[in-house]
Amino acid sequence: MAGRGKLIAVIGDEDTVTGFLLGGIGELNKNRHPNFLVVEKDTTINEIEDTFRQFLNRDDIGIILINQYIAEMVRHALDAHQRSIPAVLEIPSKEHPYDAAKDSILRRAKGMFTAEDLR
């Protein structure tokens, strides 16, 4: 019998999270904790960081998607994450385009390969 797959978690603005929820990623774990956080104007940095760390520690989550401008608020927590699972991917939002220069995870991944490896 096949095991259950891993979930995608998302931390983002209302439009981003709503889009992913409409796509079917919304789940509650056995403790009734959701796999998403809608970041609003009154959401504290501590709340974002706590949710990110909770997602990192959940064994049912395989990928964490986070709006890049929100990732900037908790960059130290993202930079401290060293495991490959859950994978953390920074994504654009409607108001903030993606900037590869700000993506520390992408920079780390690029550092793992030389030009020769990619030929």
UniProtKB/Swiss-Prot annotation:
What's in the keyword line of the UniProt record? Cytoplasmic vesicle, Hydrogen ion transport, Ion transport, Membrane, Synapse, Transport
| Gene Ontology terms: biological process | synaptic vesicle lumen acidification
The record gives the membrane topology as:
Peripheral membrane protein
The record's section on Pfam families has:
ATP-synt_F
Protein's UniProt keywords contain Transport: yes
Q: Which GO terms describe its molecular function?
A: proton-transporting ATPase activity, rotational mechanism
GO cellular component entries: clathrin-coated vesicle membrane; extrinsic component of synaptic vesicle membrane; membrane; proton-transporting V-type ATPase complex; vacuolar proton-transporting V-type ATPase complex; vacuolar proton-transporting V-type ATPase, V1 domain
Where in or outside the cell it occurs: the entry states:
Cytoplasmic vesicle, Secretory vesicle, Synaptic vesicle membrane; Cytoplasmic vesicle, Clathrin-coated vesicle membrane
Keyword Kinase among record annotations: no
Main location as per UniProt: membrane
Looking up InterPro entries in the UniProt record yields: ATPase_V1-cplx_f_g_su, ATPase_V1-cplx_fsu_euk, ATPase_V1_fsu_sf
Q: Give the top-rank taxon of the lineage listed in the UniProt record for this protein.
A: Eukaryota
UniProt note on tissues of expression: Expressed in brain (at protein level).
Q: What protein family does this chain belong to?
A: Belongs to the V-ATPase F subunit family.
**Function of this protein?**
Subunit of the V1 complex of vacuolar(H+)-ATPase (V-ATPase), a multisubunit enzyme composed of a peripheral complex (V1) that hydrolyzes ATP and a membrane integral complex (V0) that translocates protons. V-ATPase is responsible for acidifying and maintaining the pH of intracellular compartments and in some cell types, is targeted to the plasma membrane, where it is responsible for acidifying the extracellular environment.
UniProt subunit comment: V-ATPase is a heteromultimeric enzyme made up of two complexes: the ATP-hydrolytic V1 complex and the proton translocation V0 complex. The V1 complex consists of three catalytic AB heterodimers that form a heterohexamer, three peripheral stalks each consisting of EG heterodimers, one central rotor including subunits D and F, and the regulatory subunits C and H. The proton translocation complex V0 consists of the proton transport subunit a, a ring of proteolipid subunits c9c'', rotary subunit d, subunits e and f, and the accessory subunits ATP6AP1/Ac45 and ATP6AP2/PRR.
NCBIfam families named in the record: V_ATP_synt_F
Name this polypeptide is given: V-type proton ATPase subunit F
Q: Which organism is it from?
A: Rattus norvegicus
**Lineage of producing organism:** Eukaryota, Metazoa, Chordata, Craniata, Vertebrata
The gene name on file is Atp6v1f
